Amino acid sequence: MSLISADNIVKIYQSHSLVGASARKTVLHDISISIGQGETVALLGRSGCGKSTLARLLVGLERPTSGEVRFRGVPLTKLDRSGMKAFRREVQLIFQDSPGAVNARSSVRAIIGEPLRHLTSLDETRREERIQELLRLVELPPEIADRLPAQVSGGQLQRICIARALAVNPKLIILDEAVSNLDIHLQASALALLTKLQQEGGIAYLFVTHDLRLVQKFAARCLVMDEGQIVEEIKTADLDSMRHPASRLLREAVLPPLPVRAVETN
């Protein structure tokens, strides 16, 4: 059974003008995907093709117009309160815009501790122990817990967001362009960390990106998305054999390779 799946997902947005006219825009067309335990799947596509919309649907931030998102075979719409709490624990999302994903007035301790407060029954002492454990896991010093987001670097803040996502031991993390804003060395370091965590804990990833170079380093299977549709599915080892025009355009836009040493040693 898949950990999470989307079955025939359609998403339509309707907008209204000041004079009362309305317009409908279909951004996802009959999307079906599945992700298994411990699997890394890339969702590859240019900006604006619907990747982030699909990511929001998969974590329950939006509802599809038609079709179903299923968690361990059960539609999200059929989950009771305890089932939805389990879903929130097991499926986490890391956004591209890490500064926008955190409260600028909250300390790093409060940011990482947020899911622990809402999704676990840990007391304050155990929460603090878990926060310090997570900081060590993402290779950040303990004193950073007292800082505000503006007092840490971009790479550190992204690691803080990773620590927050890991706080409740998820089974799946959706990375929505989560390393795209980092420089090439920080990208390599972040991917090495995520790979290490997967090897140690069996976490599954949906890696949402427009960068084929990152897919080659991180994913085993690749879904190519264009204009709201999955147009190609291929193993990462076979990326040179991509056939769809949208896939070929992405292949031709590959950036310089990640630094090998950073990937191997971080």
Curated annotation (Swiss-Prot):
One of its GO terms (cellular component) is plasma membrane. Disulfide bonds: none annotated. It is found in: Cell inner membrane. Residues 4-252 form the ABC transporter domain. Its EC number is 7.2.2.11. It catalyses: Ni(2+)(out) + ATP + H2O = Ni(2+)(in) + ADP + phosphate + H(+). It is a peripheral membrane protein. GO terms for molecular function: ABC-type nickel transporter activity; ATP binding; ATP hydrolysis activity; nickel cation binding. It is an enzyme of class 7 (translocase). ATP binds at G45, R46, S47, G48, C49, G50, K51, S52. It comes from the Bacteria. Keywords: ATP-binding, Cell inner membrane, Cell membrane, Ion transport, Membrane, Nickel, Nickel transport, Nucleotide-binding, Translocase, Transport. Gene3D superfamilies: P-loop containing nucleotide triphosphate hydrolases. Induction: Induced by low oxygen tension and metal ion deficiency. Repressed by NiCl(2) excess. InterPro entries: AAA+_ATPase, ABC_transp_ATP-bind, ABC_transporter-like_ATP-bd, ABC_transporter-like_CS, Nickel_NikE, P-loop_NTPase. PROSITE patterns: ABC_TRANSPORTER_1, ABC_TRANSPORTER_2, NIKE. It holds the Pfam family ABC_tran. Its main location: membrane. SMART domains: AAA. The complex is composed of two ATP-binding proteins (NikD and NikE), two transmembrane proteins (NikB and NikC) and a solute-binding protein (NikA). Part of the ABC transporter complex NikABCDE involved in nickel import. Responsible for energy coupling to the transport system. Belongs to the ABC transporter superfamily. Nickel importer (TC 3.A.1.5.3) family. This is Nickel import ATP-binding protein NikE.
